[in-house]
């Protein structure tokens, strides 16, 4: 399934897993280790693109991840994070120890939160060293949860988007497939489900419907009426 559908909702609260409320950001970006980036992302190139991404947060890897979404099915997500949402402001992204928010969140990969009109995405610190391409795919999923509502249809679409974007990333940047990282394991699992379903959401939908974490979700939510 090629995901060309543009969802009209703006980025919001229900993320893949959970929520939080507060955050702070340093003025200068945090540098990361070279293995995270494709070769084109030299220090000079990153310095060049930083002004376009610095408002999302302090970690340089987010700038690279968002830039890697260019020429993928994740462009809508990229644009939403950069400010094409109801708040008309960039979504703030941060690595967090999620257990400090709630012990139940310790193993979660990502959280989303809407506080007033401000929008946030938090990524588990265990993924801080993951390849930027895997973080890009995760962000493509997160950016589809755009209000306080969630549903099985919405999760199915978001997981499928993540798989499609990861597939695109590997075509553009095959060096992103560093299997020693848990986030890459996650992305490859989704990619296999996508391939098994002949690039439809068939098996991803089955995984969503069987996920105990989603057992109380309604079938549909605004903007997601096809399951």
Regions found by a protein language model. Give the residues of each.
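Auxiliary, metal-adjacent structural segments of Zn-dependent hydrolase domains
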Residues: 28, 33, 37, 41-120, ...
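Pan-zinc metallopeptidase signature
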Residues: 3, 195-227
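Bacterial N-terminal signal peptides
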Residues: 12-22
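Bacterial N-terminal signal peptides that target proteins for export
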Residues: 2-11
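Post-HExxH zinc-binding segment in Zn-dependent metallohydrolases
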Residues: 150-189
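Solvent-exposed, acidic/flexible segments
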Residues: 55-59, 116, 128-137, 151-155
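Boundary at the C-terminal end of the N-terminal hydrophobic targeting segment
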Residues: 24-26
